[in-house]
């Protein structure tokens, strides 16, 4: 009961040995979600001063894990609830992950990529759910990627101009 098919023909069905064999035959590209993380342990790990908010979520079209869209508001919310200031909590989702892959990003400094997210702190929240993993987080007002406005007034207005970051 801790494994669930998250995409394709058997989406939402608990994975059994029988279903696994059938899915490999009939829907070999289906993804599976393992519901094995203990929320209290995740929260405890996030509170470490060197933790980074990141996700391994994989999407297939509009199917997959809700952390695909909700990782950052959920993680920042956990840190804020634990008493971290906004700058401290945001650092766990910006400059800290960048430092971990030896990347210059995640900071507002001269020479860095123009990547900014403007949020309403009172309504910034994870809204993603199983069955609707791409539900946009609440409270995201503006997003600028590589100098291009892609979210304005909470609405997507341009194509993504982001790129995959690899350790340098």
What are these regions (language model features)?
Residues 72, 90-94:
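N-terminal alpha-helical segment
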Residues 24, 80, 94-97, 101:
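Structural signal for hydrophobic packing residues in well-ordered secondary-structure cores
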Residues 165-168:
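Short, solvent-exposed cationic patches
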Residues 12, 69-70, 106, 129, ...:
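Glycine-centered flexibility motif
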Residues 43-50, 55-56, 114-163:
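C-terminal cap of metal-dependent C-N hydrolases
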Residues 1-83:
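Active-site neighborhoods of metal-dependent hydrolases
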Residues 32-36, 42, 85-88, 98-134:
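Acidic, glycine-enriched loop/beta-strand segments at the rims
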Residues 86-91, 151-152:
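Acidic/polar loop patches that form or flank catalytic/metal-binding clefts of enzymes
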């Amino acid at each position: 009961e801790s494994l669930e098919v998250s995409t394709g023909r058997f989406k939402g069905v608990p994975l059994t040995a029988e279903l696994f064999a059938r899915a490999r035959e009939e829907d070999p590209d289906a993804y599976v979600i393992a519901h094995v993380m203990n929320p209290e342990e995740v929260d405890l790990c996030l509170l470490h001063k060197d933790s980074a908010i990141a996700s391994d979520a994989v999407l297939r079209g509009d199917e997959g894990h809700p952390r695909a869209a909700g990782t950052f508001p959920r993680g920042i919310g956990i840190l804020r609830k634990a008493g971290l200031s906004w700058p401290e909590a945001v650092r766990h989702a910006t400059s800290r992950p960048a430092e971990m892959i030896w990347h210059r990003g995640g900071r507002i400094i001269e020479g860095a990529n123009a990547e900014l997210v403007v949020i309403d702190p009172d309504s910034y929240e994870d809204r993603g759910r199983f069955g609707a993993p791409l539900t946009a987080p609440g409270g995201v007002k503006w997003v600028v990627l590589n100098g291009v406005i892609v979210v304005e007034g909470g609405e997507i207005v341009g194509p993504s101009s982001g790129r995959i970051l690899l350790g340098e």
